[in-house]
Amino acid sequence: MASLMTLEVLTPDQYLMKRKDIAYVLLNTVTGGIGILANHGPLIAVLGEGTLKLQDGNNHVILLYVEGGFAEVKDNKVIILTPKAELAELSLIHI
């Protein structure tokens, strides 16, 4: 079994998500994409507007739209602070 991380997503209005079963996070930063796996080194990043890709331990993909913000990675925990976030609707995604 792959190592897993905790992910928290917070906006000024709500605590949108807390998951303890995240295997991979693809952050959309202002300087490009950064992939995060368990045991990643500490990191603080400025997020750009766009979609973050999350993958849980069962290989299910979750897409999360954020309007910028910050990400902190430390001790197998990823915290996303953003002014606005929404889970992507699968019906809106063209594959």
Predicted region positions:
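A positional/architectural concept
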Residues: 1-47, 53-55
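Short loop/turn segments at connectors of secondary-structure elements within structured domains
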Residues: 1-3, 60, 74
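Short, conserved catalytic or interaction motifs in soluble domains
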Residues: 49, 57, 75
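Short, polar/charged, low-complexity connector loops/linkers at domain or secondary-structure junctions
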Residues: 56-59, 84
